[in-house]
Amino acid sequence: MKAQELRAKTVEELNAELANLAGEQFKLRMQAATGQLQQTHQLKQVRRNIAQVKTVLTEKAGE
């Protein structure tokens, strides 16, 4: 998701997105640990998406 799309969302929507991404990250980590994860790049993508959401939340908190 692009940063511009994230900035258009409300804080509640961003928190929901963050919870969703955290759950997805957990599932991917478990798949990687058991050797079932074929597309390992997904871990990096989810980690970066979490960072983007947290950054936008911090920006909104400063406003």
UniProtKB/Swiss-Prot annotation:
Domain of life according to the entry: Bacteria
GO BP terms in the entry: translation
Stretch forming the signal peptide: none
Ribosomal protein among keywords: yes
Cellular component GO terms held in the UniProt record: cytosolic large ribosomal subunit
Matching Pfam families: Ribosomal_L29 (PF00831)
SUPFAM superfamilies: Ribosomal protein L29 (L29p)
InterPro entries on file: Ribosomal_protein_uL29, Ribosomal_uL29, Ribosomal_uL29_CS, Ribosomal_uL29_sf
Keywords noted in UniProt: Ribonucleoprotein, Ribosomal protein
Keyword Ribosomal protein: yes
Molecular function GO terms recorded: structural constituent of ribosome
Family: Belongs to the universal ribosomal protein uL29 family.
Protein name as it appears in the record: Large ribosomal subunit protein uL29
Organism: Mannheimia succiniciproducens (strain KCTC 0769BP / MBEL55E)
Gene name in the database record: rpmC
